[in-house]
Amino acid sequence: MNKIRIISFFVFLGIFTCVFQLGSMSTVSEEESALFMEEFEKLVLDIDGFGIFVHNTTIALPMFIPGFGIFWGLFSSWSTGYAFAAIVTSMPEIANISPLSILFLSPFGLMEIFSYSLAISRSFILIKAIITKTNLLQFIKPTIIEIGIVVTLLLAGGYVEFYLIELVQNESIEMPGF
């Protein structure tokens, strides 16, 4: 069982990454970008570390739903990539930053992609068990543990992301391309 768990995690990590990259390669018109940025600015106006955590958790928890979680996770991945494309359209100076570098080279990006991949792969394992009519009782404890891991990582990630945003806004650190 552990081998299947590890393999499914890495398979969905790869799929999540590819779908995110495809979303980030989307062509976004100036009008769509302006509309997105207006909504995005409203969303993050008074957000803090806990707000980021709540936002990311409301995205992550449905990913545990058997079957549905796979589609929800991949839609979330594409949407996040598309959001990056919209931001690049409105801020061309960040066009040279690889979207995958934000995902894999930032501490909060790693925590988020690990969490989402864990949740999506658990959704796959659960739907596979349902289809094969496997007793689901054996999956309760590992699923609860994984939900705990995801919530903990997203809590830490939310505060790390907020802290880094604050540092960049206060110009306490310089990030290449910003």
Whereabouts are the PLM-identified features?
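Transmembrane alpha-helix/helix-exit interface in multi-pass inner-membrane proteins
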Residues: 24-28, 67-90
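Alpha-helical transmembrane segments of multipass membrane proteins
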Residues: 60-64, 87, 159
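Mid-length scaffold segments of soluble, non-membrane domains
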Residues: 77-86, 96-110
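Perimembrane loop-to-helix junctions flanking transmembrane segments
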Residues: 31-49, 176
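Terminal transmembrane helical module of multi-pass membrane proteins
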Residues: 125-178
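Interfacial helix-start motif at the membrane-water boundary
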Residues: 42-70
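N-terminal signal-anchor transmembrane alpha helix
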Residues: 1-30
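Alpha-helical transmembrane segments of helical membrane proteins, especially in multi-pass transport
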Residues: 104-126
